[in-house]
């Protein structure tokens, strides 16, 4: 039997480099709201690694920084409509 080939239509994924590693960052500061806003959606959700290209270490630090900024009041819990 001939199987249909579905792999021809798949897009090639390019390896994204972590922007924090490329810039030489060691930690992420929760008070740096401008940087944190680049990694959250309009609704206030943290973007996943597959979209942002952030490494696993910095994704954990990013999530922790966003949550701290929310509790302090620098970022909203719910996005701005």
Swiss-Prot record:
One of the protein's GO biological processes: translation
Signal peptide: none
Alphabetically ordered keywords of this record: Ribonucleoprotein, Ribosomal protein, RNA-binding, rRNA-binding
Paired cysteines (S-S): none
PROSITE patterns: RIBOSOMAL_S18
Pfam families named among the record's database cross-references: Ribosomal_S18
GO MF annotations, alphabetized: small ribosomal subunit rRNA binding; structural constituent of ribosome
CC per GO annotation: cytosolic small ribosomal subunit
Keyword Ribonucleoprotein belongs to the record: yes
Highest taxon in the source lineage: Bacteria
Entry keyword Ribonucleoprotein: yes
Subunit structure: Part of the 30S ribosomal subunit. Forms a tight heterodimer with protein bS6.
Homology family: Belongs to the bacterial ribosomal protein bS18 family.
PANTHER family hit by this protein: 30S RIBOSOMAL PROTEIN S18, SMALL RIBOSOMAL SUBUNIT PROTEIN BS18M
HAMAP family per UniProt: Ribosomal_bS18
NCBIfam families listed in its UniProt record: S18
Record's function text: Binds as a heterodimer with protein bS6 to the central domain of the 16S rRNA, where it helps stabilize the platform of the 30S subunit.
Protein name stated in the entry: Small ribosomal subunit protein bS18
Gene (name only): rpsR
């Amino acid at each position: 039997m001939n199987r249909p080939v579905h792999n021809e239509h798949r897009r090639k994924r390019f390896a994204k480099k972590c922007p924090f590693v490329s810039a030489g960052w060691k930690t992420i500061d929760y008070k740096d709201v401008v940087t944190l806003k680049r990694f959250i959606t309009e609704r206030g959700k943290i973007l996943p690694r597959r979209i942002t290209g952030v490494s696993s270490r910095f994704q954990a630090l990013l999530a922790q920084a966003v949550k701290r900024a929310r509790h302090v009041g620098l970022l909203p819990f719910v996005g701005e409509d």
